Amino acid sequence: MFSQYKKGLLAGSVAVAALTSAAPAMAADMVALLLPENVNPRWEQQDAAAFVATMQEIAPDVKVEVYNANNDTSVQQRQAEQALTQGAKVLVVIPIDGESSAIIADTAAEEGVPTIAYDRMINSPNTKFWVQADMFATGAAQAQHVVDNTKPGDTLVLLKGSPTDPNAAVIHAGQVSVLQPLFDAGERVMGYENWTPGWDPAIARRSMDQALTQLNNNVQGVVSSNDGNAGAAIAAMEEQGMAGTVPVSGLDCTVQAQQLMLLGKQTQCGWRPLHEMAAAAANVSVRLLNGDDYSDLATEVVQNGVGADVAFVPVDSYSAVGAEGVGYVIENDPSITRDMVCQGEAAATGFCS
């Protein structure tokens, strides 16, 4: 019942084939990768794994320390201090909060250590490099998918991301660029919206439960900013017998999300080549360790929230819809296999059988 909308790439690409060589760094060098949390499995299972693997390939003598702050900004700051104390010469940070993480970049700069912002921008004049997809376009694609699979007068729910994550605001801005004209014209109805602190699915579940109660289950579409929120919304609708009848967007294309897509319960997810993002960050890390120029790895320069110019590598983004979208992700994401997706209920779907 859902149209197979969107198969195109949404953003400029990075030529990761060019990110494969670097002069050997010193054996005593160490790079620290600071993860934000473990609620979303991608950070440890995909991003960190790909970053470590790339570092082992291009700079096998460099030590990589991986930290996880479990969504606590003070913990992330302490972990950064610990990494610096242990001799880290480059910090690769996925900030919990784009503002408070500036302390990390500023402290590192005082010790002559550069900071790379991975996925989420760090609003500091000392942010050296940023790698990310076009999240505005990603949010717009999420909203467009839901619009294309609803009709005039239908009521929508928006489950937004974490208010402290700068990406969440950009994703939402992309969604609003599509939705606001329709809301203003009365062609769609904004039934309920809420932020999701820490991208916590439990909070998203409570929000969706509240939405269904307030709207008496009168919901025809869910614009969800990531797969965790999508899964929470689907679980809430499952209890009301609505799962599979309402288009639900997402982001990250986790294994669970792809299984839900094959079952027709989640209908879209935005996918980014996380292995390419990790490869870009690893290659820049080695360039920084060696004191080498890295301008050839960055295709753009952007300004962060404090007006500082930051070298930027935009990566591709893909709007995956239905079984075709699942097939594309499996084909292009080395961290996900068909066997991983074709488990449980999904194993009985036409895609897997």
Question: Where are each of the predicted segments found?
Answer:
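Short, solvent-exposed amphipathic alpha-helices that sit
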Residues: 42-57, 138-142, 166-187, 203-207, ...
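Hinge/cleft segment of the Venus flytrap/periplasmic-binding protein
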Residues: 29, 163-167, 179-180, 280, ...
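Hydrophobic alpha-helical
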Residues: 81, 93-110, 175, 193-260
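N-terminal signal peptide c-region/cleavage motif recognized by signal peptidases
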Residues: 22-23
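Extracytoplasmic "Venus flytrap"
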Residues: 30-59, 64-78, 94-98, 160-170, ...
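Flexible loop/hinge segments that line or gate small-molecule binding clefts
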Residues: 63, 98-137, 148, 155-161, ...
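Short beta-strand elements in bilobed, periplasmic/extracellular small-molecule ligand-binding domains
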Residues: 57-69, 158, 180-201
